[in-house]
């Protein structure tokens, strides 16, 4: 019935088939419905041939009853080029709804066969019978007794018969939607644009675009509507001035391209509006990347004052960031050489600010063990030869060794008597199973997170604070028993700031308490 054109290549066909598989837009119709669909395409294809051919072989078939259709066809030039990759869901959903109308019209007013490409006066479907797409598609059942459902293979065979000529689809689009212009009067947008063809369909696109630039006498404005799950571009109005098309690139950007028409007086006005719309559309964010990343654009808006200011601001920001880094490096070097007291005060205040920020950050992290793993890799390396000129107390900050659990709330001091101060806190007596369980968990991970602490407290019938303190004491004893001197401790001892070998009273008390706990647990 239809002849496969060269411009409808295998890539376009495979993409159409894949889209149909994903959208299931034709699978709900039977073979008879698709046959009527192809017949409907055949009628409009004859209209297309009548309009584009120079001979008047089809002119005799149009009588006075179809003079209105003839005038509309002659008035509508092929202004819009359908893109076979992006706009396919539009015409598929629109034409499948037109099948319902084709079923009724073929039984009453048409007498065509699937093997012929010519028609009589009764074979032309009038424009009044075409309908606009709706959100509800109800397939019409024919009078045939047996109807088999469509399969993917049958669908491929039927699609291969369709003469995918872009002028034909543009003609069908206009004949279907122009007469319904009044129903979308509230949605007319002067800045919305019609679509252009992709670079894949080379031969048909070049010929159609040339005819578009020479024969165009009206401006078609489009707006997007969502019908049947697809974004449908509906024609809203037409005017005798210019055609504005939209060019799509691989980077999913959209650029407005002006096509010259007969009226050249409004060219500057449309170009000025086009540049303004581009600036508003991209929100000044992606404007600087247009001329660098996408070379397919015809116009370049990098010379716009808004874009120039944006580029200058980016350069200024880069320069200020670089200058701040250089100033920080110079300040560190000067302070290391001159031991400036003002610099030391500044670093102390900066350390305090960093300490607060790190405490707030550690609150958000749920796992204490994860915090330790992250911070252990980010510790200040005192063995670095480039940092040996710094004093050792710079590294002796709380957040550089291990992050804290957050800022502590200081409770107001209560007046206590001397007897209460002399009383020691009650010692925790752990049982043997409790000590074994705690030791096992300590071997797995020396640091507790909140979930493990709660789980251990419930299993061992202890308070969370008791479990936490036991882990703290165990870590301290393990570190003391290893006997390994920290590099930072050696530096501090060399400078005479602190002697780590001296045992303070708190350590002695902890050892005595642990030994007493072990003795009581063994007796029990």
Curated annotation (Swiss-Prot):
GO terms for molecular function: DNA-binding transcription factor activity, RNA polymerase II-specific; RNA polymerase II cis-regulatory region sequence-specific DNA binding. SUPFAM superfamilies: Homeodomain-like. Keywords: Developmental protein, DNA-binding, Homeobox, Nucleus. One of its GO terms (cellular component) is nucleus. It is found in: Nucleus. Residues 194-218 are annotated as: Disordered. CDD domains: homeodomain (cd00086). Coiled coil: none annotated. The keyword DNA-binding applies. Signal peptide: none annotated. It holds the Pfam family Engrail_1_C_sig. GO terms for biological process: neuron differentiation. Its main location: nucleus. Residues 423-482 bind DNA. Belongs to the engrailed homeobox family. This is Homeobox protein engrailed-like SMOX-2.
């Amino acid at each position: 019935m239809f002849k496969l054109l060269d411009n409808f290549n295998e890539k376009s066909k495979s993409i159409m088939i894949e889209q149909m598989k994903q959208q299931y837009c034709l699978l709900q119709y039977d073979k008879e419905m698709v046959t009527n669909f192809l017949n409907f395409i055949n009628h409009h294809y004859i209209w297309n041939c009548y309009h584009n051919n120079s001979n008047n072989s089809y002119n005799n078939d149009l009588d006075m009853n179809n003079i209105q259709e003839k005038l509309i066809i002659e008035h509508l030039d092929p202004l819009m080029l359908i893109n076979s990759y992006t706009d396919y869901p539009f015409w598929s959903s629109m034409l499948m709804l037109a099948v319902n109308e084709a079923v009724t019209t073929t039984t009453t007013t048409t007498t065509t066969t699937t093997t012929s490409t010519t028609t009589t006066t009764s074979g032309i479907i009038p424009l009044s019978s075409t309908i606009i797409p709706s959100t509800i598609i109800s397939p019409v059942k024919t009078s045939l007794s047996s109807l088999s459902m469509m399969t993917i293979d049958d669908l491929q065979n039927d699609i291969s018969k369709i003469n995918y000529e872009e002028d034909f689809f543009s003609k069908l689009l206009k004949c279907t939607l122009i007469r319904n212009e009044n129903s979308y009067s509230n949605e007319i947008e002067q800045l919305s644009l019609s679509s252009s063809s992709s670079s894949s369909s080379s031969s048909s696109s070049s010929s159609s675009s040339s005819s578009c630039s020479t024969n165009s006498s009206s401006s078609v404005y489009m707006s997007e509507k969502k019908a049947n799950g697809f974004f449908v571009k509906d024609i809203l109005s037409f005017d005798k001035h210019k055609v504005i098309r939209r060019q799509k690139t691989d980077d999913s950007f959209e650029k407005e391209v002006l096509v010259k028409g007969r009226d050249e007086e409004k060219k500057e006005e449309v170009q000025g509006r086009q540049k303004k719309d581009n600036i508003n559309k991209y929100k000044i964010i992606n404007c600087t990347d247009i001329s660098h990343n996408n070379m397919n654009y015809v116009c370049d808006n990098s010379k716009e004052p808004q874009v120039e200011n944006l580029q200058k601001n980016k350069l200024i920001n880069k320069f200020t960031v670089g200058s701040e880094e250089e100033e920080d490096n110079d300040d560190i070097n000067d302070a290391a050489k001159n031991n400036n007291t003002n610099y030391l005060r500044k670093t102390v205040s900066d350390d305090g600010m960093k300490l607060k920020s790190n405490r707030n950050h550690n609150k958000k992290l749920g796992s204490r063990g994860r915090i330790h793993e992250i911070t252990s890799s980010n510790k200040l390396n005192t063995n670095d030869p480039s940092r040996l000129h710094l004093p050792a107390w710079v590294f002796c900050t709380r957040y550089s060794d291990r992050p804290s659990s957050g800022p502590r709330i200081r409770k107001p001091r209560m007046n206590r008597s001397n007897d209460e101060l002399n009383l020691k806190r009650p010692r925790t007596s752990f049982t043997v199973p409790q000590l074994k369980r705690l030791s096992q968990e300590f071997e797995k991970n020396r640091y507790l997170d909140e979930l493990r602490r709660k789980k251990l407290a419930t299993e061992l019938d202890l308070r969370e604070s008791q479990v936490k303190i036991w882990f703290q004491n165990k870590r301290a004893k393990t570190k003391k028993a290893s006997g390994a001197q920290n590099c930072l401790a050696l530096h501090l001892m060399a400078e005479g700031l602190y002697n780590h070998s001296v045992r303070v009273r708190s350590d002695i008390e902890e050892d005595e308490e642990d030994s007493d706990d072990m003795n009581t647990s063994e007796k029990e």
